[in-house]
Amino acid sequence: METFKDVISSDQLVLVDFFATWCQPCKMMHPILEQVKEVLGDRIRIIKVDVDKYRVAASQYGIQSVPTLMLFRHGEVLWRTSGVMQKSELLATIDPFLR
């Protein structure tokens, strides 16, 4: 079974959505992330991490608020933000990292 560390350490660009089931803005991000995945396909991997279930990972990356989005490649944090982002804004942010 793949671990969180395995996933973020890969060659592929990985967008991690740190969320909570009780968080209303997190629920708003869900369809936006699905749309981003539709546009980018295999060029990115998107995973969701429930901060209440995976407290160690959330703590390790200093997650203070949800949703928090982080981009990883080779285990390195390339970018991070907290709060809801619109699809166009998120795609524009990710695009330079796809090259």
Q: Residue locations for each model-derived region?
A:
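A short beta-strand-turn-helix
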Residues: 1-14, 55
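Hydrophobic beta-strand anchors of alpha/beta hydrolase catalytic cores
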Residues: 15-16, 46, 69
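Residue-level signature of catalytic and energy-coupling elements of molecular machines
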Residues: 16, 33, 50, 75
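Typically the conserved alpha-helix immediately C-terminal to a functionally engaged Cys/Sec
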Residues: 27-40
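Structural microenvironment flanking redox-active thiols in thiol-disulfide oxidoreductases
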Residues: 51-58
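Non-catalytic, surface beta->alpha helical segment in thiol-disulfide oxidoreductase systems
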Residues: 71-99
